[in-house]
Amino acid sequence: MSMFCYQCQEAAGCKGCTVRGVCGKTEDVAKSQDLLIYILKGISVYGVKGREVGVINKEVDNFMVEGLFATITNANFDREVFIERIKRGLQLRQELKEQVIKAGGNVENSHANKNWLDKMLSFVGLKKEEETKLPDAATWFADNVEEFNAKAEKVGVLATKDEDIRSLRELITYGIKGLAAYVEHAHNLNFDNEEIHGFMHKALAATLDDTLTVDDLVALTLETGKYGVEGMALLDKANTQTYGNPEITKVNIGVRNNPGILISGHDLRDLEQLLEQTKGTGVDVYTHSEMLPAHYYPAFKKYSHFAGNYGNAWWKQTEEFEKFNGPILMTTNCLVPPKDSYKDRVYTTGVVGFPGLKHIDADEKGEKDFSSIIEHAKKCAAPTEIEKGEIVGGFAHNQVFQLADKVVEAVKTGAIKRFFVMAGCDGRAKSRNYYTEFAQKLPKDTVILTAGCAKYKYNKLNLGDIGGIPRVLDAGQCNDSYSLALIALKLKEVFELEDINELPISYNIAWYEQKAVIVLLALLHLGVKNIHLGPTLPAFLSPNVANVLVENFGIGGITNVEDDMKMFLG
């Protein structure tokens, strides 16, 4: 059986990748990821049972988060990494099972009739006692790659035959993957939330439960959104308490004459360590793609060698990494399989991986030694300039709340007629040029609220301002969509509205991978309706599941700029 993956927006033919991922993922990597997810779901069965008797294994919880994060689109392409995670996952599953048994938990086959009356009726033959077996994912074991390969053929997405059940199971799983990314970043800053871990176990274990109906899974999907909000709140707290609240900042997009290191991804703790270790070395540090918003945090402004942002969204890296000349550090997704011409300059860390690239691990305390990449940088030429100028950002919730009076007055006077939330992801599809054209053609009395790398479609267009308020307000990384939600809730409060959907806010969101999925589910949990997703709707939404989202939440796609503009503006 060939691979099957449809977790991202680039799913081939908007159906699924079956030979090789459009992302560059090979068939053997895809299947090893399938098996790892299967093992993680099996661990979650014991994670749920453990919590029933007070057993919480933090090593297991962290392993779950890292494993889920590693399977996100464009994070890790190294099959050997997944094989090792599968082996370790099986070990941890057994260890957790033994801990649950020791605590008095029931880890064997359970019975549906648990109360005393049912048991008595069953004993006298008046009621059948149904045995519910542990799912195979909680019991299957192997210790060699041959058996791993054989099992991986049987446990992929298509193992669930019912199209709607499959669709909802995958929607939940992808949401949990996105949530795992945010939890991992918070964990790296020593912030955690046990309740979120507990829910992740519950949700993943539920995807193995064949007794759950479509309605059950729809409810669980919305509950996933609830924990998406909590996960983004946790990361917002971690980032702001560690580095301060983002503030309005001009970021240089040109270059200096020193050699440099380009840091990409999302992990601010990695950036902090790199900046500390490059002090006084003569090596500058530049951000790339989703690392741009790091410039908005006060704590990073003390580094004189924090030079600016180089390049654009992740998908342009094959040409931009070539021109940067120095080494690149990938802290998280999105990694594109590198060209041979610059492959020796790419370093990975955290959950990122690609065969042949140099990987930098953390020690037991979470500290990383970046001396090798710094020494590499010293031998390289300064970056080739690809653009000049500045871009402005830093409009997260705290900063916007400080401007609240100005914003509210602009709305009341009609200077601002409508806000457009255009958060989300960028990607290589030409159809995404829609978002550039859409931004250009928006009326001058509208303001764009953005977060995530979708901003690169319009953050350099110089769209002007309204009474000193920039028409593009960049809150930060994709997880900072949380700020956009808080801003909307604040406006609802200020204008004394009962429903968030009464606000003059439209949602035209570009999605790409699984973090966008958890952001979407979080918005649905908050009651936001009439969200439009593009450039295509997710391939993993079956017609019936898509219809549920349309009927209950007004989810829609996009068509063309002219027609959509009329639709949004009425």
Swiss-Prot record:
It is found in: Cytoplasm. The modification Cysteine persulfide is found at C425. Pfam families: Prismane. GO terms for cellular component: cytoplasm. Gene3D superfamilies: 1.20.1270.20, 3.40.50.2030. Its cofactor is [4Fe-4S] cluster; hybrid [4Fe-2O-2S] cluster. Keywords: 4Fe-4S, Cytoplasm, Iron, Iron-sulfur, Metal-binding, Oxidoreductase. Hybrid [4Fe-2O-2S] cluster binds at H266, E290, C334, C425, C453, C478, E513, K515. It catalyses: A + NH4(+) + H2O = hydroxylamine + AH2 + H(+). One of its GO terms (molecular function) is metal ion binding. InterPro entries: HCP/CODH, Hydroxylam_reduct, Prismane-like_a/b-sand, Prismane-like_sf, Prismane_a-bundle. [4Fe-4S] cluster binds at C5, C8, C17, C23. Binds 1 [4Fe-4S] cluster. Binds 1 hybrid [4Fe-2O-2S] cluster. The keyword Cytoplasm applies. One of its GO terms (biological process) is response to hydrogen peroxide. The keyword Metal-binding applies. HAMAP family: Hydroxylam_reduct (MF_00069). NCBIfam families: hybrid_clust, PRK05290.1. Catalyzes the reduction of hydroxylamine to form NH(3) and H(2)O. Belongs to the HCP family. This is Hydroxylamine reductase. It comes from Clostridium tetani (strain Massachusetts / E88).
